[in-house]
Design a protein with these regions (language model features):
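Residue-level marker of intrinsically disordered, low-complexity segments enriched
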Residues: 6-9, 16, 30-31, 45, ...
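Non-catalytic N-terminal targeting/anchoring module and adjacent flexible stem/linker
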Residues: 1-42
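Flexible, charged surface loops at secondary-structure boundaries
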Residues: 41-45, 117-120
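Conserved alpha-helical elements of sugar-nucleotide-dependent glycosyltransferases
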Residues: 76-86
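Short glycine-rich His-centered loop
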Residues: 26, 32, 39, 45-78
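Glycine-rich beta-alpha loop elements in corrinoid/cobalamin-binding modules
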Residues: 83, 90-167
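Short, amphipathic alpha-helical segments that act as regulatory/interfacial helices
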Residues: 50-53, 88, 92
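Short, flexible segments with low predicted structural confidence
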Residues: 58-63, 88, 114-115
Length: 167
């Protein structure tokens, strides 16, 4: 029975076969970008490991420590990044290190991005916490885009730890 006069709203479009589409075949630029990063000469200021307390979400003073998880400081004071300093002390002199506390230096994202280029860290190590997670990940993104391997620690690095640990 053919119903040519039926309104399109009354026809069950889900009952017909949908042709399979081929997968998108985008060019892979990874090798070219990676080669360009490796070919670039390292500056005299380049470090092995950059330990970072990234810029804060709103430019205010925030606390990122294991026992004061990612909150604005009520006291309006800078909490020193003792954990980053301790790790730097353990890594030096075997590795060249740079500790950057953007919170203490009142450094914004633009200034921090400009700081990454001369130091060209091989590894970017930072503390993360749930309240500032998106902000903290942006720092990792900037470092990774410049060829650094990123390392994060903290109380709430991810809401999906099992998925994160998969290869």
């Amino acid at each position: 029975m053919e119903n040519k006069n039926l309104d399109i709203k009354t026809i069950n479009l889900g009952a017909r076969n949908i042709p399979k589409l081929r997968n998108a075949d985008f060019p892979n630029a990874d090798a070219i970008v990676h080669e360009g990063l490796l070919a670039a000469s390292r500056s005299p200021e380049a470090v092995d490991i950059m330990l970072v307390n990234p810029p804060t979400p709103d430019g205010g003073l925030w606390i990122r420590t294991q026992h004061r998880v990612g909150r604005r400081t009520r006291e309006n004071m800078v909490w020193p990044q003792v954990s980053l300093a301790q790790m730097a002390a353990l890594l030096h002199p075997v590795y060249t290190v740079k500790v950057v506390d953007c919170n203490a230096e009142r450094m914004g994202w633009h200034e921090f991005t400009q700081l990454l280029d001369p130091y060209q860290p091989k590894y970017y190590l930072t503390q993360m916490t749930a309240p500032t997670l998106e902000n903290d990940i942006y720092g990792c993104f900037l470092a990774h885009a410049r060829g650094a391997k990123t390392i994060a620690f903290g109380t709430h690095i991810t809401p999906i730890p099992v998925e994160t640990m998969r290869p």
